Amino acid sequence: MRKIFVKTNNVRNFIGLVENLQNKPKNIPKMGLVYGEPGLGKSQTALWLACKYDGIYIRASNLMTSRWLVEEIVREMDELPRYLTSDNFNVVISKLIQKPRIIFVDEIDYLMNNYKSIETLRDIHDKTDCPIIFVGMGLALRKLERYKHLYDRFSEIVKFETFEIEDLSQIFSQLSEIPFTPDSIEYIHKKYNRFRQIVQLISKLETIAKENGLTEITFEIIKELV
């Protein structure tokens, strides 16, 4: 299987969100939300974009406090966390003013019930004018709407949708070293619509094809295997 980052429609929408936030005037809020069901490639895309744009990628976790969150941001800036949370916060603000960077906060659902952490991210945004992008699950938008004063700052929102047949064809053509016929991809599309599932399926079918000397995967073969 080829190691290629496939730019599906979801990925292109995520890229568009990032570029739109970067290009907004100073007086326009630069917070964004990317949300959707699990397994659609949100985290992989956020990590890829953080590398592409020299951003800061933070993965929130259960029980994460605002202190812990700020310390993680400080570490991602290649700084040693200070003892006082206020000192760490000032380091983050100072560094971002010197060198503006996008902050990606993945698994944001873990922080949605932690008002202080959400407020901390808002304060970082307001003091630095740096884009901050929340990445969350299917209910993230609804949870975010509870914070009315914060929700107004989200000028860009993208929902990751399940794959269309065109997305699936693109994924198979770019990742698989064994060709798949169009009707075989249509059959797979009816059964699989999560990126993780599809990658695992490609790996499995490539192995079977190589072991059996198959030069392509057809509809008849897929029906027997999937």
Predicted regions and their residues:
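C-terminal alpha-helical "lid" subdomain
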Residues: 2-16, 39-48, 149, 166-226
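Walker A/P-loop nucleotide-binding motif
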Residues: 25-47
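Sensor-1/coupling segment of RecA-like P-loop NTPase cores
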Residues: 32-38, 124-148
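Conserved P-loop NTPase "ATPase switch" module shared by AAA+ and STAND
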Residues: 93-117, 131, 136
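Conserved NTP-binding/hydrolysis module of P-loop NTPases
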Residues: 54-55, 66-83
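A short helix-turn-beta junction within AAA+ P-loop NTPase domains corresponding to the substrate/partner-engaging
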Residues: 55, 145-162
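Conserved catalytic segments around the Walker B and adjacent sensor/switch elements
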Residues: 32, 50-63
